[in-house]
């Protein structure tokens, strides 16, 4: 598997890796292998869906393919996460969930040099909630990081808040090969 990852890294700008060992660690050894792989596929499906929505849905603060390319081009390993929450602390809960995917390869998010954040909410998104999300992202990112934030307003989505994050450019995770 590592040989395949090494070969693939030379052809892609960014790479999301889910190690097989994480399946057992997260879901336990008594989980069906088929169920474990389906759970991993759900994570990858969510990543693809999140990136697709970022590119295709026009937002109040728009993020487009050029922004995704800016954050992902030539950046090595990537982390993609999404979190949804409602209630009093929904911003903190959604961004924390988005930043913590137990299946992803042991990537330390601190020091990311590229971060794309997309916030989806109803018209009830507050300035304080927007700031909570931005503050949490700035905590994990490199001080010189390129942080791009988008915001999609879904009028029929009152109460729920979704945060999708793509983080790249982890110095310790970048491939040393050309």
At which residue positions do the language-model features occur?
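Tubulin/FtsZ superfamily GTPase core signature
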Residues: 1-178
């Amino acid at each position: 598997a590592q040989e395949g990852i090494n070969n693939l890294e030379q052809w892609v700008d960014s790479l999301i890796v889910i190690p097989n060992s994480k399946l057992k660690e997260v879901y336990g050894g008594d989980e069906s292998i088929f169920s474990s792989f389906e759970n991993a596929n759900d994570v990858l499906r969510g990543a693809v869906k999140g990136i697709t929505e970022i590119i295709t849905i026009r937002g109040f603060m728009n993020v487009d393919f050029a922004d995704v390319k800016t954050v992902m081009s030539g950046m090595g390993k990537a982390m993609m996460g999404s979190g949804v929450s409602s209630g009093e602390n929904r911003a903190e809960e959604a961004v924390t969930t988005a930043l913590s995917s137990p299946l992803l390869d042991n990537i330390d998010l601190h020091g990311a040099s590229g971060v794309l954040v997309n916030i989806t909410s109803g018209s009830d998104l507050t300035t304080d909630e927007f700031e909570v999300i931005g503050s949490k992202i700035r905590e994990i990112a490199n001080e010189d990081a390129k942080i791009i934030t988008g915001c999609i307003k879904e009028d029929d989505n009152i109460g729920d808040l979704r945060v999708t994050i793509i983080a790249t450019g982890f110095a310790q995770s970048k491939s040393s090969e050309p």
